[in-house]
Amino acid sequence: MEKVSFEQFKEGYLDAIGQDSDEVIRSIYDALKLPKTCDKRIGWIRFYAPRAITLKPGETAKIPTGIRAKMEENWVLQCYPRSGLGFKFRLQLNNTVGIIDSDYYNSDNEGHIFAKITNDTKEGKTVEIPAGTGFMQGIFMEYGITVDDDVEEVRNGGFGSTTK
């Protein structure tokens, strides 16, 4: 796991969050924490919020993590909301499970991982995630393909790139 370049983070940040000064964006970028496990006995890595996030019931946020993941072929990174946030607030990833393929690392956006989350509470609760705290967890999984899978195409991109 590593950071994307500052230029890529800034582009993703402005698209997801909106206008902020270069100084603010630089300070957020410099403070990014690389995902890591919180215990050597577990397989999950924790992604940290680059800035404070507050979501009222029904609100959604697109989060530029500033992170990219390099992995071997036949591996995938699966991303989920942190269990406690899902349990307490029904915080959900909008695509249910985030799937990051190994080829995404070399995409035009440097493989910048984004998360789109929604506070789907049925109890009127507001979710507050302070900057630098975990909001999403991921696990690397190996996968197989069928013996007769003869795809030769090479794609570039994330969402929707497999249907082109």
Model regions: which residues?
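DUTPase catalytic domain/fold
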Residues: 1-164
